[in-house]
């Protein structure tokens, strides 16, 4: 935000007149070696970097509404290799951090705990994993392929409660670290009172409830807000960063064809009698 002659909170001073212009900046530092390695990977793919954008910020662009960014919110992007944090207030990014635990760590815990291949562990995580156990978990059985053996012949059955017992501790550790990072950030309480969860790992059952329990804050599960032309298959929380990068390119690098969906992507069709009204109800509710 800019400060012009003592007037604070100015987002864009272009066209304004004054004697003294100040600006408050948020700087993000990254490991030099890791950044150079990413540039090298892009170069080998014959791609050029237009601008670096921190992933949690991009996810915030995709998932947060303007009122949230104005009033104060912290976004938690639960990615594969890490969990990104981004706090917005007054419409601007004011704090970022990264917790070095992500969805891949949960997958590895399942693979080690159940002695199963990584692919099978990922499959079980997506279909059966839960952060909070249920009353039927001890009775519900899951087939677990064994490492290094034929999948159909070696599968053994375990109760779903065992899988929950493996997954929950890692998620608890993640949110406890998130809580510690937020508490030590020095950011105003109002900006961290509301939490928005997104990212692939946020899709695990019960994650929102566990986050609210540990962080003791209001939690909303989010997916990218509709972008015109974006397919439904790539509009989930796991694609939040990609959607945010598209919006960033549209705003900063002149891509007018990329814009938010301003109307219902599936507008109701004219009803034709009773059957038409039934079809309209099904489209609206399912």
Q: Where do the language-model regions lie?
A:
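Phosphate/pyrophosphate-binding loops at sites that engage ATP/ADP/AMP, CoA/4′-phosphopantetheine
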Residues: 175, 179-193
